Regions:
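Short glycine/proline- and aromatic-enriched beta-strand/turn motifs that initiate or cap beta-hairpins
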Residues: 3-74, 166, 235-245
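Extracellular loop and loop/strand-boundary signature of outer-membrane beta-barrel proteins
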Residues: 53-56, 119-125, 172-181, 218-228
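Residues that define the transmembrane beta-barrel architecture of outer-membrane proteins
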Residues: 8-12, 62-66, 127-135, 182-188, ...
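Outer-membrane beta-barrel translocator domains and adjoining extracellular loop/strand segments
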Residues: 26-33, 95-101, 166-176, 217-223
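Glycine- and aromatic-enriched membrane insertion/assembly motifs of diderm outer-membrane
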Residues: 32-122, 197-199, 203, 209-215
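Gram-negative (and chloroplast) outer-membrane scaffold detector with strong preference
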Residues: 69-170, 239-245
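Outer-envelope beta-barrel architecture signal
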Residues: 6-14, 78-82, 131, 149-155, ...
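Predominantly the C-terminal beta-signal and adjacent terminal strand-loop region
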Residues: 26-30, 34-43, 193-245
Length: 245
């Protein structure tokens, strides 16, 4: 009886792309015990900062809002994968809006509006990244394949959970924090994509994603901030498949 060597097919893939986002309005909760301040900035509006729409080829690839994926299709049908999914997104509180401040500030009850501008002492950036990291399960649904297998079109479904790693920079009432990266909470996301593969190895992927993030213990001057928001994201990526045997 002849033993047969069991071969488990697999495909490693890697991609790089760029994104844009739209965020839900959200409240930022500030706690500064040493200043006797505990208040919220109510239903503030935030926006992204694409970067790739201005002189993309004249700056480092990692300065604009980018996306990185690395994954592995592990089953016989090559339709199930695990994936590390990183989105370098940016969240910036929109300058010039009238922001409601409600709670306790320096021991006094407040409920008023401020002009949220840098010249007035206010800015709030997750600008070197709101930074969503997800560990995904991926499912592939074939749509179309040419007879000679030189072109394939697939629908991809992805779902995952993971940490957020924001870069936090802000000033509130003229009091600025020390900007830094930190582990700042968690996020979960669901993503669908159309994936066009050419000659088996190169692919272009157009994705849409809904992500929900909860941030906590974000550094502000002598205190912390917390917030949560959802965002809708569009992503275009270029990738490479590597067959493993």
């Amino acid at each position: 009886m002849q033993a047969q060597e069991s071969k488990r097919p697999g495909t490693l893939y890697i991609s790089w792309g760029y994104n844009t986002e739209w965020y839900t309005n959200n409240s930022i909760h500030i706690d500064q015990p040493s200043l006797n301040s505990k208040y919220e900035i109510v239903k503030i509006r935030g926006e992204d900062h694409r970067g790739w729409d201005k002189s993309l080829l004249k700056q480092d690839l990692t300065i604009p809002q980018y996306n990185f994926r690395i994954g592995y299709f592990f089953n016989q049908n090559q339709d199930l994968a695990i994936e590390i999914n990183f989105d370098h997104t940016k969240f910036i509180v929109r300058q010039g809006q009238q922001a409601q401040i409600k709670g306790i500030f320096t021991g006094n009850q407040v409920d008023n509006t401020v002009n949220f501008t840098e010249i007035n002492g206010f800015y709030y950036f997750l600008n070197n990244g709101a930074n969503f990291l997800l560990f995904n399960i991926v499912k592939r649904y074939p749509i179309y394949t040419t007879a000679n297998n030189t072109f394939k079109l697939d629908l991809m479904g992805k779902v995952g959970i993971g940490p957020v790693i924001p870069h936090v920079q802000n000033s509130l009432f003229g009091l600025a924090n020390d900007p830094s990266f930190q582990f700042g909470g968690w996020n979960t996301g669901i993503e669908t994509a159309l994936k066009a593969t050419i000659y088996r190895y190169v692919y272009l992927e157009l994705s849409q994603k809904i992500d929900y993030s909860r941030y906590s213990n974000l550094k502000v001057y002598q205190g912390t901030a917390r917030q949560n928001f959802a965002c809708y994201e569009l992503i275009l990526s270029l990738g490479l498949n590597l067959k493993l045997r």
